[in-house]
Amino acid sequence: MSCVPWKGDKAKSESLELPQAAPPQIYHEKQRRELCALHALNNVFQDSNAFTRDTLQEIFQRLSPNTMVTPHKKSMLGNGNYDVNVIMAALQTKGYEAVWWDKRRDVGVIALTNVMGFIMNLPSSLCWGPLKLPLKRQHWICVREVGGAYYNLDSKLKMPEWIGGESELRKFLKHHLRGKNCELLLVVPEEVEAHQSWRTDV
């Protein structure tokens, strides 16, 4: 699984005040080159310093040492187009685990209070500057709760997309999981994964 190149502005974060009674401060990292995995991770942790490109590159090299044959090869593979193994290993360095969601299961059994956030891999339109091409590639996005509501923190969005409460979130997840080539990861603390307390049907 990989992410879609994006020729937009450089990655940047914004503290956005959204129109609510008590506007939450939301960290939303924007897309730069092929670094959507990095942006999704930082958006999950709501921290611009949670991970860097160098951190993910070190993890990638550790997981795939035999792929780093020459400096040219290293440059070609080190473009930030990271797969699920890098994301899972990165989360483990922070004491978290990525639980792969079986799409045959009902999202209604997810124990949302025990899940810090969600990372989704889904098809996204391929763009070149302002032009949208008739092609799609896989893209990493983050969804998480901030200030009592859930937001889509896709790094390609201009600002966080409000989803709503728990019922709206489940509808959002169901909608995307019905599509082709969509995968869902639950980001949970290690102890939650160990006891499988991310689910209510155990």
Curated annotation (Swiss-Prot):
One of its GO terms (molecular function) is cysteine-type deubiquitinase activity. The active site is at 36 (nucleophile), 139 (proton acceptor). It is found in: Cell membrane; Cytoplasm. Residues 23-202 form the Josephin domain. Monoubiquitinated. Ubiquitination activates deubiquitination activity in vitro. Its main location: membrane. Its EC number is 3.4.19.12. Signal peptide: none annotated. The modification Phosphoserine is found at residue 15. Pfam families: Josephin. Keywords: Cell membrane, Cytoplasm, Hydrolase, Membrane, Phosphoprotein, Protease, Ubl conjugation, Ubl conjugation pathway. InterPro entries: JOSD1/2, Josephin. GO terms for biological process: cell motility; endocytosis; membrane biogenesis; membrane organization; protein deubiquitination; proteolysis. One of its GO terms (cellular component) is membrane. It comes from the Eukaryota. It catalyses: Thiol-dependent hydrolysis of ester, thioester, amide, peptide and isopeptide bonds formed by the C-terminal Gly of ubiquitin (a 76-residue protein attached to proteins as an intracellular targeting signal). Interacts with beta-actin/ACTB. Deubiquitinates monoubiquitinated probes (in vitro). When ubiquitinated, cleaves 'Lys-63'-linked and 'Lys-48'-linked poly-ubiquitin chains (in vitro), hence may act as a deubiquitinating enzyme. May increase macropinocytosis and suppress clathrin- and caveolae-mediated endocytosis. May enhance membrane dynamics and cell motility independently of its catalytic activity. This is Josephin-1. The gene is JOSD1.
